[in-house]
Amino acid sequence: MVEPIFKPGDYIINRSAGDMAIIDKVTKKNYYHFKNYYGGMFNEFKNVEDKSYDLQVNYQKFFDLCNEEEKKKLDELIKNRGK
C-alpha cells in the first residue's frame, strides 16, 4: 500500500497536465478529497462539493507541491471563479 505524501492544506500540481488542487483530507481508504481542483486541460474547476471527484493515493506520483508562484495562480483562479 502506498502511503500518502501530501497532507491537508497542501497545494499540489500536475505540471504536465496543468491540474492544480488544494487537499482537504485523506480518507482511511487512501483517497484524497479536495477543497478545490482545477483541471488544466479544460480550464475548469471540478465538482468537489459532493466528494464525487477524488484521487487515489497511487496517483500522487504525478503531482508535486506547488511553489509560491503556482499557489498565487491557483488562489487567483479561485478568487475569480464564476466571474
Residue ranges of predicted features:
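Intrinsically disordered, low-complexity, charged/polar segments
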Residues: Y38-K83
